[in-house]
Amino acid sequence: MTTWANMNLQDSASPIMEQLIYFHDHALMIIIMILMVVSYMMIAMVFNKYINRFLLEGQMIELAWTIAPAVILIFIAVPSLRLLYLMDEINTPTVTLKTIGHQWYWSYEYSDFAKVEFDSYMIPQDEMDHSMFRLLDVDNRAVLPMNTFIRIIVTAADVLHSWTIPSLGVKADATPGRLNQVSFLINRPGVLYGQCSEICGANHSFMPIVIESISTNGFINWILKMNM
């Protein structure tokens, strides 16, 4: 999760988020280079008088400032399109989790197993202990196995919501009457935090998302416990 005064992105917990961080750094490097070149040219124009009465045209410079931006855009667009394809790709899922947004809590249904469904509410501040995070911890976490392809089916029961886990690079709009799906793989154990990312009413800020990533054996034991 994010930490106090953190200026960077959250640590990735999925291959997609790793690729998003790489693309962010790649695009930022190009932007910084453009900023340096443009800043140098502006400063040079201020402190130098480049005046040539005999210069009537500059076809080469016009050609250069037409081709150079096109090449730069290609260097940005190619990895971006590749990443969009990877994010939209759905592998054969081992576990399917249906997520339903409500005002103002989440419901989870494990469609592959019988009788495994529950609601997830934010824990009020007066019921928290010192190990919990304000406005982020919930009473029932969604438990998922790591190193396993997971499909999330997202919908809403009332208004627009958005199911978002930044450390997984996952954001899916929850629309009433419509099913959206995303696929991801969690590559490490831990507790992952997120929040609704769509303005959905007065208590929009109070419907956090908590995913607990555990081993496959631990997940099977949890499913057996939930079915008892």
Swiss-Prot record:
Which annotated residues bind Mg(2+)? E198
Topological domains on the Mitochondrial intermembrane side lie at: 1-26, 83-228
Spell out which residues lie on the membrane's Mitochondrial matrix side. Answer: 49-62
Supply the alphabetized keyword list.
Copper, Electron transport, Magnesium, Membrane, Metal-binding, Mitochondrion, Mitochondrion inner membrane, Respiratory chain, Translocase, Transmembrane, Transmembrane helix, Transport
Give the binding site residues for Cu cation A2: C196, E198, C200, H204
State the compartments where it is located. Mitochondrion inner membrane
Q: Which reaction does it catalyse?
A: 4 Fe(II)-[cytochrome c] + O2 + 8 H(+)(in) = 4 Fe(III)-[cytochrome c] + 2 H2O + 4 H(+)(out)
TM region positions? 27-48, 63-82
Which residues make up the binding site for Cu cation A1? H161, C196, C200, M207
Cofactor binding description: Binds a dinuclear copper A center per subunit.
Entry's Gene Ontology BP terms: ATP synthesis coupled electron transport
What EC number(s) does its UniProt record assign? 7.1.1.9
Q: Which SUPFAM superfamilies match?
A: Cupredoxins, Cytochrome c oxidase subunit II-like, transmembrane region
The protein's matches in InterPro entries, at most eight in alphabetical order, are given as: CcO_II, CcO_II-like_C, CcO_II_C, Copper_CuA, Cupredoxin, Cyt_c_oxidase_su2, Cyt_c_oxidase_su2_TM_dom, Cyt_c_oxidase_su2_TM_sf
Domain of life the protein comes from:
Eukaryota
Q: Name one GO cellular component term.
A: mitochondrial inner membrane
Spell out the family assignment given in the record's similarity comment: Belongs to the cytochrome c oxidase subunit 2 family.
Q: What does this protein do?
A: Component of the cytochrome c oxidase, the last enzyme in the mitochondrial electron transport chain which drives oxidative phosphorylation. The respiratory chain contains 3 multisubunit complexes succinate dehydrogenase (complex II, CII), ubiquinol-cytochrome c oxidoreductase (cytochrome b-c1 complex, complex III, CIII) and cytochrome c oxidase (complex IV, CIV), that cooperate to transfer electrons derived from NADH and succinate to molecular oxygen, creating an electrochemical gradient over the inner membrane that drives transmembrane transport and the ATP synthase.
Q: What is this protein called?
A: Cytochrome c oxidase subunit 2
* Species this protein is from: Periplaneta americana (American cockroach)
Name of the coding gene: COII
